[in-house]
Amino acid sequence: MIPVVALVGRPNVGKSTLFNRLTRTRDALVADFPGLTRDRKYGRAEVEGQEFIIIDTGGIDGTEDGVETHMAAQSLLAIEEADIVLFMVDARAGLMPADHAIAKHLRGREKATFLVANKTDGVDIDTAIAEFYSLGLGDIYSIAASHGRGVTQLIERVLLPFSGKGEEEVVELTEEEANAAYWAEQEQNEIEMVEEEEDFDPSTLPLKLAIVGKPNVGKSTLTNRILGEERVVVYDMPGTTRDSIYIPMERDGREYILIDTAGVRKRGKITETVEKFSVIKTLQAIEDANVVLLVIDAREGISDQDLSLLGFILNSGRSLVIAVNKWDGMSQEDKERVKEMLDYRLGFVDFARVHFISALHGSGVGNLFDSILEAYDCATRRVNTSLLTRIMHMAEEDHQPPMIRGRRVKMKYAHAGGYNPPIVVIHGNQVTDLPDSYKRYLMNYFRRSLKVMGTPIRIQFKEGANPYADKRNTLTPNQMRKRKRLMAHLKKR
């Protein structure tokens, strides 16, 4: 089984920096603010061929209040989940009371615990780490996570019980044998890549579902309702999720990765540097997702921020499902008013399913996954060229394209140009000059004909040059005789 390593410690000791270095991503927000990581975040990492799962947690400083108490609880849960705990301390800041409190908790757990002194670059290491021996956790491993110094050696040491090294027989190869083995491996890799492309089936991959919306619309409550556990910090204060949290799950035999994002608020209200980071992470999560679940607060209605977020989702070409949350407790009159407003302001995304839910009580949440799967299946469905060309000609017969500069537009054939979102490429003469109204007509015609729901369709137009423009036909003997008779007739005139 792949080992699980948890990073714990006070806020701002460098846990997220180490997480990012090990996972080779920027999935954890990193800046010089205490308390940046509020939830536990999972990542897959590999050091010297040894794979492991790393958990980044919120900091514990012993003075938790409000949401900070929840952060501490998330860190303690991560300790229980882990096989190995890396207890990180700040060599520059020195020993703090919270370090003693965390060490006391760890000593009471039967976990492999390693004391890691970070930020040792530019200091006298022996002097800086000496006081941490009073924590009673044995050897101290000094690293500089921001520069990577000591990180590989640390991970190799903590993973040693899981590596199984020392069992393998070392075989010496000659230079010729090593070269032959290398090129054989490269050839095999190329063959496997081709086979993987031919056999690609999107249903075998985890479906990435990004849950997005303004702050405090109930995204984390919905995530926890779906998961059935308090996995993401939920606290009635806008902005309690500052980072995008990637959470693997399984439902009805299908694998998913839920992405719970920080809320996106009006640009003028984004003041803290950390919140600007969070907006970027939300937009990156949308780009990374297969399906986006946009959560709207029924009691606040559709705001400009919601429409801005919708615009970004559409520009990204992602499949879309809309969840109108906090539907419980509203009067029938208010519900009808909200529905009318949705019809009016969301008419441009009429392809998206809209669900009315209560994330807090669970009503309507189960039905979301029918629409999520429908949207993903429509976005990744393979359609052959003959069917797309037939639909194109049907659309042309039902509504002829307008004349362009006195000439009739000729659409020749259509084929698939990509998936997620579905792209239809139409080839022909003057097709790029078609008016936007006719392009929208074609897009809607393809959508209806293919029964596509939950995902935008993109139509691309290409004009091919005449392949015979610079070539002269080779005439048959019969054609040559006809040509001579025609030329003789023209001369007589």
Curated annotation (Swiss-Prot):
Where does the chain bind GTP 2?
A: 213-220, 260-264, 325-328
Annotated residues that bind GTP 1 are located at 9-16, 56-60, 118-121
**Stored CDD domains:** EngA1, EngA2
Q: Which Gene3D superfamilies match?
A: 3.30.300.20, P-loop containing nucleotide triphosphate hydrolases
Domain of life of the organism encoding this protein: Bacteria
- Family annotation (Pfam families): KH_dom-like, MMR_HSR1
PROSITE patterns in the cross-refs: G_ENGA (PS51712)
| GO BP of this protein | ribosome biogenesis
Q: Where is the EngA-type G domain?
A: 3-166, 207-380
KH-like domain mapped to chain residues = 381-465
Q: Which function does this protein serve?
A: GTPase that plays an essential role in the late steps of ribosome biogenesis.
Its subunit composition reads: Associates with the 50S ribosomal subunit.
Name of this chain's protein = GTPase Der
Species source reads Photorhabdus laumondii subsp. laumondii (strain DSM 15139 / CIP 105565 / TT01) (Photorhabdus luminescens subsp. laumondii)
Q: What is the lineage of its organism?
A: Bacteria, Pseudomonadati, Pseudomonadota, Gammaproteobacteria, Enterobacterales
